[in-house]
Amino acid sequence: MKKQLVNMKGTKDGFVLRLDDQCAYSDLVEELKKKVLEGGIDGKVDVQLYLGYRYCTDEQIDELIHIVQETEQLIVASVQSEVLTVHESNQKMIESQQDTYLGVVRSGQILRSSGDIIIVGNVNPNGRVEAGGNVYVLGKLKGIVHAGVQGNKEAIIAASQFEATHIMIADQVEAMSDEHVKEINQAEMTCAFIGYDGRITYDQIHALKNIRPLLNVSKGGS
């Protein structure tokens, strides 16, 4: 039985077109053309192209999108790949680096790191910390923190005492009121992260093992 090189699966948001990542590119193109011409679709539908571990040039991706959208019913909403571009790979390497700062981040001071940063000390009101990765404050966090400044939505902010005025993770921003600080300021170290709903949420630090399991692996924890 001939192996299917293109599989189409329906989802609540439209369709996912899974493209074989082992076959010759020319064979994939031919089967994709046949698949999208099968018809049976009413109206316009969003499609996600999933390339798996196949590396495609920009020109090849444009060609695949063009083939799918020739039908007019199918609209490519996104292209997903497990292959990192050089830029993405470099960015991950930068974000995996870790800096340690011993001391107080004072009012008006800005502390920056391209990767993770561990602060052993307090972040005073109007002190600011910016990091490409995660921010850990082993002390009182009373200033402003931006984790994942390059858009890393997996970044977290953790502090022994969480009293920040503003926190940002990737493109999400939250101003914290006194009431909010009282609600989240547990006896244990508190962390902030982007939850499943796309909003900043809070939990105790021990919950990170379930919330960000890869964080535990990447830092060599147990």
Swiss-Prot record:
Tagged with keyword Transmembrane helix: no
Gene3D superfamilies referenced in this protein's UniProt entry, alphabetically: 2.160.20.70, 3.30.160.540
Superkingdom of this protein's organism: Bacteria
Keywords recorded for this protein, A-Z: Cell cycle, Cell division, Septation
Matches recorded under Pfam families: MinC_C (PF03775), MinC_N_1 (PF22642)
Record InterPro entries: CAP/MinC_C (IPR016098), MinC (IPR013033), MinC_C_sf (IPR036145), MinC_N_1 (IPR055219), Septum_form_inhib_MinC_C (IPR005526)
Recorded family membership: Belongs to the MinC family.
Subunit structure and binding partners: Interacts with MinD and FtsZ.
Name used for this protein in its record: Probable septum site-determining protein MinC
Species assigned in the record: Lysinibacillus sphaericus (strain C3-41)
